[in-house]
Amino acid sequence: MKLEESLKKCPVIKRGEYNYFVHPITDGIPLVEPSLLREVACRILKIVDFSEVDKIVTAEAMGIHLATTLSLYTDIPFVIIRKRSYGLEGEIPVFQKTGYSKGQLYVNGIKEGDKVVIVDDVISTGGTMIAIIEALKRAGAEIKDIVCVIERGKGREIVEKKTGYKIKTLVKIDVVDGKVVIK
């Protein structure tokens, strides 16, 4: 499959002590091939039931292309959790911390009773996902499913234990000796 093959070839860089893999799905570089994006979307569509979903929710920035593609396939609108405040009525600020960054995220466009699927590119520490889940619960949304394309580290387990929500992933990886390894 293209996703796994492309992961095996992607470069790994250091961000402080964090080994950061650089991949089209997670970083938009070096090049996002339509066939790779299509494969990822089709694989998500096979494992997530969108039939009772009102909105697809993703975090800025690297979930946007995933949510856009899924929205085009399903005709379900999507909401982007942004890194800056717009000051709109009902905006929900939420703090998130990852393995290499931290800061505020802002949720807009979610109403009480909305049925949502959360889509993200990668889950590694779980910090962003926990923040998103907490914000959506505060807004009164019903989380129908959660899917992350790439799983790395213990983030999925941490989120599931802390929130009670199961997270689906397409591929699990690790970084060993400066290379991505498929598990």
Swiss-Prot record:
What InterPro entries does this protein's entry cite? HGPRTase-like, PRibTrfase_dom, PRTase-like, Pur/Pyrimidine_PRTase
Q: Residue span of the signal peptide, if any?
A: none
Q: List the Gene3D superfamilies hit by this protein, alphabetically.
A: 3.40.50.2020
Residue ranges of coiled coil: none
Reply yes or no: does the keyword Glycosyltransferase apply.
yes
Work out whether the entry's keyword set contains Cytoplasm: yes
- Pathway membership, UniProt: Purine metabolism; IMP biosynthesis via salvage pathway; IMP from hypoxanthine: step 1/1
Q: Name one GO biological process term.
A: IMP salvage
Question: Can you state which reaction this protein catalyses?
Answer: IMP + diphosphate = hypoxanthine + 5-phospho-alpha-D-ribose 1-diphosphate; GMP + diphosphate = guanine + 5-phospho-alpha-D-ribose 1-diphosphate
Query: Which top-rank group of organisms is this from?
Result: Archaea
Quote the subcellular location field of this record.
Cytoplasm
Q: Which GO MF terms does the UniProt record name?
A: guanine phosphoribosyltransferase activity; hypoxanthine phosphoribosyltransferase activity
Q: Might you report a single GO cellular component term?
A: cytoplasm
Q: Which UniProt keywords apply?
A: Cytoplasm, Glycosyltransferase, Purine salvage, Transferase
Q: What is its EC number?
A: 2.4.2.8
User: What is its quaternary makeup?
Assistant: Homodimer.
Q: Which HAMAP family match?
A: Hypx_phosphoribosyltr
Assigned protein family: Belongs to the purine/pyrimidine phosphoribosyltransferase family. Archaeal HPRT subfamily.
Annotated function:
Catalyzes a salvage reaction resulting in the formation of IMP that is energically less costly than de novo synthesis.
For this protein, the record's NCBIfam families field holds: HPT_Archaea, PRK02304.1-4
Write down what this protein is called.
Hypoxanthine/guanine phosphoribosyltransferase
The species this protein was found in: Methanocaldococcus infernus (strain DSM 11812 / JCM 15783 / ME)
Output the lineage of the source organism: Archaea, Methanobacteriati, Methanobacteriota, Methanomada group, Methanococci
**What is this protein's gene name?**
hpt
